[in-house]
Amino acid sequence: MENKHIPFEQLPITNKFMFAMVFSHKEIAKPFLEAVLGIKIHELRDPEPEKTIEVNPVSKGVRFDVFVKETGTSGETLRSFDIEMQMEDTKEIPKRARFYQAMRDSETLSKGEKYRNLKELYIIFICPDDIFGKGRAVYRFKNLETDDPKIEMGDLCFKNFYIFKKYRDVAEKSIRTYLEYFATSKPISPETEDIDRLVKWYQTDNNTRIRYMTWQEEIDIAVDQERQRADDAEKRANEEKARADKYEKMLRDLGKL
């Protein structure tokens, strides 16, 4: 779990706020995506840190850590990427990835638009611990036919999970250097040195400090609201149970049970 009491000037790259700030620079995000996905990217639009999507006021929304699109020569979207720094195993991360895909797709298609207009979507979670418990450092998922895994569903959605504490188990050096930096905060490549320089710059920037304080207040408010909703739900459940118990007792007293 993230420690919100870490002094601002010591915030590491694994802090959600710091991660979003640093990876909102496309010169940081592009080589990272190319390295961990093994692809070449034509051009990235400026990444959007803490991008929020809400389909309607009553449905659950989503806030992406960093959301970015690859564009072609005419500015058209080729692929989209959601990059998440996830320090806590909430036991629901795979289902969160499913929800993120649904929210992203619902925002992408306008009413009446063809499904074929959906582009490749990569959802990337960077975690300290192995949330699947299978001992791997990298998990890559896509939809395949159960009886014949050579047949791909072709929905163009890919969900990858990178376990940075297991960086020593990663064969690909391009991926390992990033995971090692997330685990140790020690840069060992030109790309991670660029990240580290930005981290240190943000740690000393007063405007970023103010922005972080506002962000932390919003997080605290959201946590309090979620806690209140949980308390209200528990209270309603207890009240319903009390009414049911009372009704059952009445029936027993009347000899109908």
Regions found by a protein language model. Name each.
Residues 2-7, 69-77, 81-86, 172-257:
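Short, charged alpha-helical interaction segments and adjacent helix-coil junctions
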Residues 20-24, 165-169, 183-186:
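Generic amphipathic alpha-helical segments used as scaffolds and interaction surfaces in large
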Residues 156, 163-174:
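Extended serine/threonine-enriched, polar tracts that run as long, contiguous segments within proteins
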Residues 1-157:
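Accessory alpha/beta interaction modules
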Residues 125, 162-163:
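Short, conserved beta-strand edge motifs with alternating hydrophobic and charged residues
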